[in-house]
Amino acid sequence: MAVPKKRTSISKKIIRNTLWKKKGYFTALKAFSLAQSLFTGNSKSFFCNKYKR
């Protein structure tokens, strides 16, 4: 039968949680930055139609 290993320390848990949260923060920041550049029309890496007909 499988036996659980030693308990993960609180500090390790906090470090992992912080890294996980930072990852989400930077992803959201990138998405917001792209949305801003699309809105202002300064985007050089994303192609979209500027005019609606």
Swiss-Prot record:
Domain of life: Eukaryota
Molecular function terms from GO: structural constituent of ribosome
Keywords: Chloroplast, Plastid, Ribonucleoprotein, Ribosomal protein
Coiled coil spans: none
Pfam annotation, one family: Ribosomal_L32p
An example Gene Ontology biological process: translation
InterPro entries, per database record: Ribosomal_bL32 (IPR002677), Ribosomal_bL32_plant/cyanobact (IPR044958)
GO annotation, cellular component aspect: chloroplast; large ribosomal subunit
Main location: plastid
UniProt-annotated location(s): Plastid, Chloroplast
Family stated for the protein in its record: Belongs to the bacterial ribosomal protein bL32 family.
Protein name: Large ribosomal subunit protein bL32c
The species this protein was found in: Phaseolus vulgaris
Originating gene: rpl32
